Every structure is written in C-alpha cells, then in structure tokens.
C-alpha cells in the first residue's frame, strides 16, 4: 500500500475513533451514580450523566465531596459517559 493510502487509512481510523460513542460496556461504573450535590454550599453548575435519560444533564453542585459522576463541562461528561 502506498504512503498516501496508509495516511488515508490512518485518518479514517482516527476519525472513526473520535466519532464513535462510548458503548455502555465501556462506560465507567461511576457514570451510573446519581447526581450528588455534596454537603458544601459553594453552589456552581456541573454536569452528570443520567443513565435513564442517556445524556449529560446540568445540576447544581455544592463544591465539595459528591461523587465521581460530576463534570465541569457537558463535553467532558459526554466524552466520558455518553453512549
């Protein structure tokens, strides 16, 4: 195969990897945890993955503790948990 063909194949495989969603079997278990505001009162917007809705949803986070299903951005949540 020519170097141009190899580069095209590599580019297509990279694109496929980026665009393929996380499958439920590859999704971290913490993505199944419910949203947890935590005990603090430094309220800020955060995102959690909702297995029932199959999407990342914004919620109010207290700023400490909570659980691992807590992301600063919707993009971070989707790249980690969304299927």
Curated annotation (Swiss-Prot):
SUPFAM superfamilies: BPTI-like. Residues 1-24 form the signal peptide. Disulfide bonds join 31-81, 40-64, 56-77. Expressed by the venom gland. Residues 31-81 form the BPTI/Kunitz inhibitor domain. GO terms for molecular function: serine-type endopeptidase inhibitor activity. It comes from the Eukaryota. One of its GO terms (cellular component) is extracellular region. Its main location: secreted. InterPro entries: Kunitz_BPTI, Kunitz_BPTI_sf, Prtase_inh_Kunz-CS, TFPI/VKTCI-like. Keywords: Disulfide bond, Protease inhibitor, Secreted, Serine protease inhibitor, Signal. It is found in: Secreted. PANTHER family: KUNITZ-TYPE PROTEASE INHIBITOR-RELATED (PTHR10083). Serine protease inhibitor. Does not inhibit plasmin, and does not reduce blood loss in the mouse tail vein blood loss model. Belongs to the venom Kunitz-type family. This is Kunitz-type serine protease inhibitor textilinin-6. The lineage of its organism: Eukaryota, Metazoa, Chordata, Craniata, Vertebrata.
């Amino acid at each position: 195969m020519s170097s141009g063909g190899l580069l095209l194949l590599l580019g297509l495989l990279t694109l496929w990897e980026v665009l393929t969603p996380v499958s439920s079997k590859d999704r971290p278990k913490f993505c199944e945890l419910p949203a947890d505001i935590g005990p603090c009162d430094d309220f800020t917007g955060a995102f959690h993955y909702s297995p029932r809705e199959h999407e990342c949803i914004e919620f109010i986070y207290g700023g400490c503790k909570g659980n691992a299903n807590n992301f600063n951005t919707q993009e971070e949540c989707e790249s980690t948990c969304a299927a």
